[in-house]
């Protein structure tokens, strides 16, 4: 864990080694036909949108995706280099090269047809009774065939130093319950298309028309019943209401028809590790407990077979994979064509062996100097957030002291892990099918999780993203912020650009992740990562009142005719966006106070800060993807992460001379502020 100096000893320092004569901005990204005071997103990103039309293989394409594409090309260079050589069996190079070759070999997959999944499908068909099918589910428990709830080891949110078995709702192929129960025309169209898709997939897997129709109806009926007892994405955001700790004895009493001990035992989990568990959604488990008793053998068969289909469709013939893409890519998201083979293959290797690929990636592409710059930026943002906490008049000194304690104990991860996962037990066998090897990878990760987490303390060195990922995160149970090497590149971070650009780009990202520790979810966890109330009643009430204003504000943003942002679902991300802006701007001003920056390319330093921020969220997106994200993405759309945030930032008004009558203008008494 990084040692943090006490707050009173911390000072903001300039980021050394950064040039002061480059703006980092690209004039072509701007649309000067738009007044920044009326639509800052369009002014800052309109040119980028024109220069980067939506590729037919994408439903959304933004600067995040652009950078991830560049990283994927680098990863592909690594893999093609490995592919050309021979390696001893069992080496990580052999595993990467052989898996990549399998992912590329579409001719072999087309020749094999359904052979990789026929044995398990025949087993399911041969099972004649419910008892036979339940035994078969136990045999394949590690693959979750037909299981309608999720179980995995993760931190106990009220004893965050230890792992515990967490049990929660699952069983919806479409992810969000609204797809099954809402009756607006767009949702009904998706629902009808989903039924046709289920039918088509069963036929492609060898079932005749009558069998496919029967299984389609069973799957859709069962998933709809599960949707009716499921919580919405918004309801899943409340940590306290999704935490119910109980003994195994109590679980068995409450849900007598869910044989947890038998299921987990079949997964390889010893009984002593499940004597106490956490149930996320008790009403879901109660509903499922009743639903299970009503299932017929045909229902169970259909669910198990559907699990096989959905778990294998991307790894079998072109015809099957294309049918999968037609629904999830085209119908659900508005993509026109699938990614090229090299990209799909590269992504599959990353999905299964991403961290070991990341180890090669950082050696080749991540300069240690970038890590040094980031450490200083993070330090400065940490100081700034402490100052922002002190400046809040709605908080008591008692709560501020606890907030500082939490801020001081942030675990900071930059670039890549200090220790790497061990892949020695993973066997990649090129004589077996691509799908068989994917299953081997999944079982390896499943078993590794059990081995490393069941009954054991939380490993604070574990990374939840690979180093090459273009993203960042805050984890409340370890109180950590993580910035993988993948995001530490242009247009978020440029060691040759001045502080205005870097604080507006990666600085806001850092501030965003830090603010997550104090958003509506993060504030419920203490300095040690435990879900524990450290707020006075008055301060908690003040926080909730202010946060609710953000939810209401975003509820009124119309993203498509008749479709609005979900302010409750996106609340945490919106609070983090606004807090990140405030914290990073404050840090930037202090870091440059003794060495003021110059106007470059016609823009003042403060203007460049906000242009860099807006550039982070430049994108093009389909209407279908907008609808999909509004239903289940906790992030607001890119446009509104800019135009929804900046009207509340006082410094933005000064930098861009925003006045009454301008479309970006909000009266001071309507500007929201939390951090």
Question: Which stretches of residues belong to each language-model region?
Answer:
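Active-site-surrounding "flap" and adjacent substrate/cofactor-binding loops of secreted or lumenal enzymes
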Residues: 35-38, 43-108
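Bacterial Sec-dependent N-terminal signal peptides
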Residues: 1-20
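Hydrophobic/aromatic-rich, well-ordered segments within soluble, folded domains that form packed cores
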Residues: 29-50, 180, 184-204, 571, ...
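Structural recognition of the beta-strand scaffold that forms the well-ordered cores
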Residues: 39-43, 164-166, 480-484, 517
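Short, Gly/Pro- and small/polar-rich lid/capping loops
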Residues: 20-28
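Noncatalytic, helix-rich "gating/capping" subdomain that lines the substrate-entry/channel surface
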Residues: 82-376, 380
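Short secondary-structure subsegments characteristic of cysteine-rich extracellular domains
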Residues: 57-79, 212-229, 502-508, 601, ...
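Intrinsically disordered, low-complexity linker/terminal regions across diverse proteins
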Residues: 68, 219, 254-258, 278-282, ...
């Amino acid at each position: 864990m990084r040692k943090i100096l006490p707050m009173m000893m911390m000072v903001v320092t300039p980021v050394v080694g950064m040039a002061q004569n480059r703006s980092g901005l690209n004039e072509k990204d701007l649309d000067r036909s738009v007044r920044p005071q009326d639509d800052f997103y369009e002014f800052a990103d309109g040119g980028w949108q024109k220069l980067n039309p939506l590729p037919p293989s994408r439903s959304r394409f933004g600067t995040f995706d652009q950078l991830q594409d560049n990283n994927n090309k680098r990863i592909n260079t690594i893999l093609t280099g490995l592919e050309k050589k021979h390696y001893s069996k069992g080496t990580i190079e052999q595993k990467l090269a052989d898996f990549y070759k399998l992912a590329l070999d579409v001719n072999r997959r087309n020749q094999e047809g359904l052979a990789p999944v026929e044995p398990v499908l025949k087993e399911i068909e041969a099972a004649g009774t419910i008892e036979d099918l339940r035994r078969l589910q136990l045999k394949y428990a590690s693959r979750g065939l037909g299981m309608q709830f999720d179980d995995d080891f993760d931190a106990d949110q009220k004893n965050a130093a230890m792992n515990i078995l967490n049990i929660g709702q699952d069983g919806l192929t479409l992810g969000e319950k609204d797809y099954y129960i809402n009756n607006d025309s767009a949702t009904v169209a998706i629902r009808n298309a989903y039924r046709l898709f289920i039918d088509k997939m069963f036929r492609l897997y060898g079932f005749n028309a009558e069998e496919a129709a029967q299984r389609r109806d069973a799957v859709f009926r069962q998933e709809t019943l599960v949707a009716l007892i499921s919580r919405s994405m918004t309801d899943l955001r409340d940590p306290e209401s999704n935490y119910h700790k109980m003994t195994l004895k109590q679980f068995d009493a409450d849900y007598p028809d869910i044989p947890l001990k038998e299921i987990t035992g079949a997964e390889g989990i010893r009984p002593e590790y499940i004597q106490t568990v956490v149930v996320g959604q008790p009403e879901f488990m109660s509903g499922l407990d009743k639903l299970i008793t009503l299932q017929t053998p045909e229902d169970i068969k259909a669910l198990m077979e559907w699990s096989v289909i959905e778990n294998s469709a991307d790894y079998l013939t072109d015809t099957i994979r294309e049918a999968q893409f037609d629904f999830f890519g085209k119908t659900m998201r508005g993509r026109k064509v699938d990614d090229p083979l090299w990209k799909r293959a590269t992504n599959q290797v990353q999905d299964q062996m991403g961290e070991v690929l990341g180890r090669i990636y950082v050696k080749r592409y991540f300069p240690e100097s970038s890590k040094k710059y980031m450490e200083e930026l993070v330090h400065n943002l940490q100081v700034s957030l402490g100052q922002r906490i002190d400046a809040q008049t709605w908080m008591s000194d008692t709560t501020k002291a606890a907030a500082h304690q939490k801020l001081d104990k942030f675990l900071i991860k930059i670039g890549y892990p200090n220790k790497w996962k061990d892949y020695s037990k993973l066997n990649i066998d090129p004589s077996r099918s691509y799908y068989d090897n994917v299953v081997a990878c999944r079982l390896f990760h499943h078993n590794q999780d059990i081995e490393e987490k069941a009954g054991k303390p939380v490993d604070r060195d574990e990374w939840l993203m690979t180093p090459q990922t273009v993203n960042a995160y805050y984890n409340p149970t370890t109180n950590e912020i993580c910035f993988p090497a993948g995001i530490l590149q242009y247009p978020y971070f440029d060691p040759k650009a001045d502080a205005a650009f870097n604080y507006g780009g990666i600085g806001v990202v850092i501030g965003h992740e830090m603010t997550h520790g104090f958003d509506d979810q993060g504030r419920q966890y203490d300095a040690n990562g435990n879900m524990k109330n450290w707020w006075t009643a008055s301060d908690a009430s003040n926080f909730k009142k202010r946060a609710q204003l953000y939810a209401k504000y975003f509820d009124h943003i119309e993203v498509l005719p008749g479709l609005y942002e979900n302010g409750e679902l996106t609340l945490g991300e919106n609070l983090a966006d606004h807090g990140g802006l405030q914290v990073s701007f404050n840090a930037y001003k202090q870091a440059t106070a003794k060495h003021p920056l110059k106007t470059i390319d016609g823009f003042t330093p403060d203007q460049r800060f906000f242009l860099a921020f807006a550039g982070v969220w430049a994108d093009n997106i389909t209407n279908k993807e907008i609808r999909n994200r509004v239903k289940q993405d906790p992030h607001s759309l890119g446009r509104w992460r800019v135009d929804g945030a900046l009207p509340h930032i006082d410094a933005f008004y000064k930098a861009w001379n925003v006045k009454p009558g301008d479309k970006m203008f909000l009266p001071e008494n309507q500007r929201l502020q939390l951090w």
